Every structure is written in C-alpha cells, then in structure tokens.
Regions:
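Zinc-dependent deaminase
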Residues: 1-20, 73, 89-150
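Small-residue (primarily alanine) positions within well-ordered alpha-helices
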Residues: 13, 17-20, 30, 56, ...
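A short helix-loop-beta-strand connector motif used in the catalytic cores of GNAT acetyltransferases and
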Residues: 22-25
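Short beta-strand scaffold segments in enzyme catalytic cores
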Residues: 28-36
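A short, polar/charged loop-to-alpha-helix boundary motif
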Residues: 45-58
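Local cysteine-cluster metal-coordination motifs and their immediate loop/turn environment
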Residues: 54, 77-97
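Mobile, glycine- and charge-enriched loop segments
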Residues: 57, 61-81
Length: 150
C-alpha cells in the first residue's frame, strides 16, 4: 500500500483519537482496513466505559465484529500510538499481518516481539500524533500513567 493511503487511513484513526479526547478519554484511535475499506474503528474508551481493557485497538476490533481468520489475514490495523502488550496479543492472535502506527516516541509497545512473529510494522512518525499525546500527558499525567500501568 502506498504511503499516501497509509496517511489517509491514519487520519481516520486520528479522528477517532480526537473523538475520545472530546469524550473525556485518552486520545488514541484505531481503524481496521480490509482491501482498502475501513471495516472497524475505535478509540480508547477506558475512562468513558470504566473499562480495564478498552484500548483503541481493542475497541476497533470489537466494532469490526466477528471475522474469519482469512479476513484478518487481509487486514491492516492503524493506531495513532504503538500498540501495548494486550493489543499486540490480539493482533497476533487474529493474524493481522500489518500494523501502521502514528508514533512510538510517547510509548513503544512490544514492536520487536511483533516483528519476530511476522508482523510488518510501519511507523509514520507523525508530528500530529506526537503533539496530541504530549498535550494530553501534560494536562492529565495521572490518567496517562494509569493507562500504561504505572
């Protein structure tokens, strides 16, 4: 997939992140794309739902609904931030072959582990994603630390 397509889909993930922020949550968004079409979208809703597990990628996968293994094999998941251990586990479990991330400076999940298991990682290193997280962490450091388990 061409870089500009990745940027377009990442912009949808950014929209999800901004939606989460407007709702009072953590600004991380995700979309699941199959054959050039978004089939799932989500954002971190741990705060909004009082959930321990509703990270953006988990919300996105949940909203995509049940899919066959062959469907996941044709997907790309986009996340505004490097996926954590839990979300990486779901990506590996369902065999999603490609993960496109907005940035990994704020938080770097188990990217090497993903690569060792055959996942292709593309880091767009977008200033917009970094700024969104920097601003959020400056405003709500305690909530951010809770989200990453610190």
């Amino acid at each position: 997939m061409k870089q500009n397509k990745h940027i377009l889909f990442m912009q949808e993930a950014v929209r999800e992140a901004r939606k989460g922020l407007r709702e009072g949550g953590i600004p991380i968004g995700s979309v699941l794309v199959k054959n050039g079409r978004i089939i799932g979208r989500g954002h971190n809703r741990r705060v909004q739902k009082g959930s321990a597990i509703l990270h953006a990628e988990m919300d996105c996968l949940e909203n995509a609904g049940r899919l066959a293994a062959k469907d996941y094999e044709q997907c790309v998941i986009y996340s505004t931030l490097s996926p954590c251990d839990m979300c990486t586990g779901a990506i590996l479990l369902y065999g999603i072959p490609t993960v496109v991330i907005g940035e990994n400076k704020t938080f770097k999940g188990p990217e090497n582990y993903s690569k060792k298991h055959g996942v292709r990682l593309i880091n767009l290193d977008l200033p917009e994603c970094k700024k969104m997280m920097k601003d959020f962490i400056a405003a709500k450091p305690k909530l951010w630390n809770e989200d990453i388990g610190e």
